[in-house]
Amino acid sequence: MIKTETSKIKLINEDNLRLDGRSFNELRPIKIEAGVLNRADGSAYIEWGGNKIIVGVYGPKEAYPKHSQDIDHAVVKARYNMAAFSVDERKRPGPDRRTMEISKVISEALSSSIMIEQFPRAEIDVYIEVLQADAGTRIAGLTAATVALADAGIPMRDMVVGCTAGKVDGHIVLDLSKEEDNFGEADIPMAIMPKTGEIVLLQMDGDVTEDEFYEATSMIIEATKKISQIQRNALLNKYKIEGIEGGE
């Protein structure tokens, strides 16, 4: 994220609307589809704003090599990757520091939600491929990954759902756009398990006051109610389609 005080880009207009016409607490359009990869144990595709991300889940299976096994529970290995064509400037192939950090925090968030104790010595691989990037890819990828895990039939305590909020032109806004992410004052990605309210991912880039932080997190929690329903609808739609096809 680029934070610059010299930037003169105005991100909020005189009508208190953002550059894309949204109000402060309005989400970008979100579409999720489950079961999109035939050879994966579970999969999902998400479009969130301009983001396009596909997720494949493989496992639980015996962890290999054996020294990577945990005798008490499964190990969740998320691999987040941005395709070379996913951003305007061509990205060098292979993992970098950012993708490794995002892979780690997604692995930890998913591990909190999965009943990993049911699968000792196993591993669950989660491949997250960003086909098109438009701000908030870690949260969009995580939100799709939990749908893919459910599609794989892996038992979970709850599905993980997240969103971002941030500070733009002095205002707290929900679900940052690419321009807001690049030129805003702060970005706060957050993910929770809705049933318990447990926070499984929370980061911040930039500066906000304590009141602004609570405003941002409250805005995210409210938004997750809508996103959670989109997740569940994706799974219901998949099984509805399978039921129709099975009855033919």
UniProtKB/Swiss-Prot annotation:
Annotated GO MF terms: 3'-5'-RNA exonuclease activity; RNA binding
Entry's EC annotation: 3.1.13.-
Highest taxon of source: Archaea
Subcellular location(s) of the protein: Cytoplasm
Top EC class of this enzyme: hydrolase
InterPro entries named in the record: ExoRNase_PH_dom1 (IPR001247), ExoRNase_PH_dom2 (IPR015847), ExoRNase_PH_dom2_sf (IPR036345), PNPase/RNase_PH_dom_sf (IPR027408), Ribosomal_Su5_D2-typ_SF (IPR020568), RNase_PH (IPR050080), Rrp41 (IPR011807)
Single Gene Ontology BP annotation: gene expression
HAMAP family: Exosome_Rrp41
NCBIfam families cross-referenced by the UniProt entry: ECX1
Similarity comment text for this entry: Belongs to the RNase PH family. Rrp41 subfamily.
Protein name: Exosome complex component Rrp41
Organism: Thermoplasma volcanium (strain ATCC 51530 / DSM 4299 / JCM 9571 / NBRC 15438 / GSS1)
